[in-house]
Structures are given as C-alpha cells and as structure tokens.
C-alpha cells in the first residue's frame, strides 16, 4: 500500500502511524534491492539538500550524502563551525533562509525543540538526523535489519531488549518504534537511566492499541529471556562530560553485552545490534583511555560478541543509507 508522505517532516516516530512506518521500511527494502540490481530510478533529480551538522557524524552524514547522490540530488554540508546558527542567527531565521534555497534540510544536533522549530518554519521537508531526545532514522534502519534476520517474521512477532542507558535518544526511539509496531521490547538498565516517565506512559498507551509490550527492568536475565535481538549503545553520549565516565561505568558494568548475556536469552540464534560507534576494544583513543583507567577492553559490548556470528552491526550500519534514502524519496521525491 502506498502512502503520500510528500512534503512531510520526519522529526520523530511519534508523528507517524504504524502503517506509515511500515511503508517507509518496505520502501527502504525496495530501494536497497534496486541499488543492488542496478535498476534504481532517480526520484530526486534537480533537488538541493542542506545537511546541518551541529554534532560530528560518520554514518549519518555518509548515509545522507550517498542516498542523495544515488537519487540525483545535490547536497551542501554545513558543519559545526560552518554556520551562524544560534550565534548570530536564530534557527527560526535560518529555517526561513534555507527553506528558500533548498528543497529539503537534514538537522543533526542538540535539543528536539531545535529541529521542531526548523521544521515549523523552513517550508520544506526537514529530517531529524539525531537530537538529544530522538534518533528516528536509526530506528528505521534497525527495524529493516531485524526483518532481514528474522526468517519471515513480522515486526509484531519480534522480541528484543535494549541494555544500558535507556534514556538516551536511541533508547527513547526504540521504545517509540516498538510501541508503534506492536513489538515486545525490554529496556534493561539502572532505573535512573530509564526513559522519561511521560514518554513511557505515552508509549504504553500506543502499545496497548498495537498489541505491543514494553518492559522496564534492572534484571538482565529477566529482560533478555527469549529475545531475538539484543541491542546496546555507548554509555556516555555525544556532548556529555568526560567526567561522567566514572559514575556511568560503575552503574552500567552489569549491563554489558557479553557471551553470558547472549546465553541468558536461551536463543542460540540471538543477534546483536549496536548503532555505532562502539567501544568494544582498546583500538581507539577513548577505548584505550577506558582500558587503562577501568581495566576493561570493552565497555557496552565485548570484543568477543561484537566480532561474533551473532553480530549484525554492519548490516545495520549499511541500512542507515537505504532507510534515509526512503525517507527523502517519500517526502521529497517526484
């Protein structure tokens, strides 16, 4: 079934129905097949797209740029030091300027209110590449990846757990997405790091309508039992103080995804997911600092799990591009 999402913003999954989200995932799968088959049709020819990045990025920037180029669009990258936003010019004014020059705008930055204001005043489709509260394009990629590794299951038949800092943008967005799609999600971590109570209540109400299930628990064994997928993210997010590491590592260490946690699912075919980047060894600057300070060569996930046959993180990363392409084509394409 086709949906007309033309000229819609893509700011958070709460704005979209179950059928609209499924449509975007299905479109992503179709576009992925077309790219692999060499039969892709350019739906964004002649379009100009602005990519605003107030936070650094690898996957999101590359995904937007490659997706746009594949579809025939031109992009302008505006980096953290490449604009006057918030310094000499408000987002409201920036939106009204860029909206007259560009056909679509991506924003990756800080508060959700910023991208909401951009979306309200730009007059063209605005896409959320990540804010402190939500990361909706990531969840489209996650759900496409789950479907690819579920042997024909529908999303509503999938059970998964997110371990660690569940109050961050990925934890929030996975909970919203699971509620919308009628999935069974467990958020497993210290209670102090559970999502905001108001958002949990809203998601519980959605899940009641879709047949989904949301569980919040501090008990790892309880949270992962029977899961098809285990998901985690870094314990300290972009923009947080380095001083947060001491307290965070102590709290989060019991929620590291390791081989014992995989076994606790009782599912020998369980898959591991991570939005990346991941601290799974000491081969990065931060990874080495953490190893030296805490005696841990992996934080949220061990090297053994990350490099195992259970890990599908690079399928997941690739799908960022296909799902972002679907969002742009659906909201902007001819």
Curated annotation (Swiss-Prot):
Record's catalysed reaction(s): carbamoyl phosphate + L-ornithine = L-citrulline + phosphate + H(+)
Family to which the UniProt record says this protein belongs: Belongs to the aspartate/ornithine carbamoyltransferase superfamily. OTCase family.
Protein's UniProt keywords contain ATP-binding: no
Designated name of the protein: Ornithine carbamoyltransferase
Binding residue positions for carbamoyl phosphate: 57-60, 84, 108, 135-138, 275-276, 320
The enzyme's E.C. designation: 2.1.3.3
Biological function: Reversibly catalyzes the transfer of the carbamoyl group from carbamoyl phosphate (CP) to the N(epsilon) atom of ornithine (ORN) to produce L-citrulline.
Organism for this UniProt entry: Vibrio vulnificus (strain YJ016)
Top EC class for this record: transferase
Binding site for L-ornithine: 169, 233, 237-238
Involved pathway(s): Amino-acid biosynthesis; L-arginine biosynthesis; L-arginine from L-ornithine and carbamoyl phosphate: step 1/3
Gene Ontology molecular function: any one: amino acid binding
Tagged with keyword Transport: no
GO biological process, one term: L-arginine biosynthetic process
GO cellular component: cytoplasm
UniProt cross-references to Gene3D superfamilies, sorted A to Z: Aspartate/ornithine carbamoyltransferase
Compartments, as annotated in UniProt: Cytoplasm
Alphabetically ordered keywords of this record: Amino-acid biosynthesis, Arginine biosynthesis, Cytoplasm, Transferase
């Amino acid at each position: 079934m086709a949906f007309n999402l033309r000229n819609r913003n893509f700011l958070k999954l709460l704005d979209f129905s179950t059928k609209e989200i499924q449509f975007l995932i299905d479109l992503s799968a179709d576009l992925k097949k077309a790219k692999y088959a060499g039969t892709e049709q350019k739906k964004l020819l002649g379009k100009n797209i602005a990519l605003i990045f107030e936070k650094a990025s690898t996957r999101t920037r590359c995904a937007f740029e490659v997706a746009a180029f594949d579809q025939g669009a031109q992009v302008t990258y505006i980096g953290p030091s490449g604009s006057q936003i918030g310094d000499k010019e408000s987002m409201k004014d920036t939106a009204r300027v860029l909206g007259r020059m560009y056909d679509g705008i991506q924003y990756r930055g800080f508060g959700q209110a910023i991208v909401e204001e951009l979306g309200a005043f730009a007059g063209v489709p605005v896409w959320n590449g990540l804010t402190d509260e939500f990361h909706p394009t990531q969840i489209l990629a996650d759900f496409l990846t789950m479907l690819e590794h579920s042997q024909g299951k529908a999303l509503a038949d999938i059970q998964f757990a997110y371990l660690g800092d569940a109050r961050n943008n990925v934890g929030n967005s996975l909970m919203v997405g699971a509620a919308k799609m009628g999935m069974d999600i467990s958020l497993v971590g210290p209670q102090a790091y559970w999502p905001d109570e108001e958002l949990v209540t809203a998601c519980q109400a959605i899940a009641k309508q879709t047949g989904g299930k949301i569980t919040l628990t501090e008990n790892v064994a309880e949270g992962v039992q029977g899961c098809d997928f285990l998901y985690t993210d870094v314990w300290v997010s972009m923009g947080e103080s380095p001083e947060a590491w001491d307290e965070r590592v102590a709290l989060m260490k019991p929620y590291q995804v390791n081989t014992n946690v995989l076994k606790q699912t009782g599912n020998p075919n369980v898959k591991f997911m991570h939005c990346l980047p991941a601290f799974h060894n000491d081969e990065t600057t931060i990874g080495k600092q953490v190893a030296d300070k805490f005696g841990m060569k992996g934080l949220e996930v061990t090297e053994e799990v990350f490099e195992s046959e259970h890990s599908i993180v690079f399928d997941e990363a690739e799908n960022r591009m296909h799902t972002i392409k679907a969002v742009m084509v659906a909201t902007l394409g001819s």
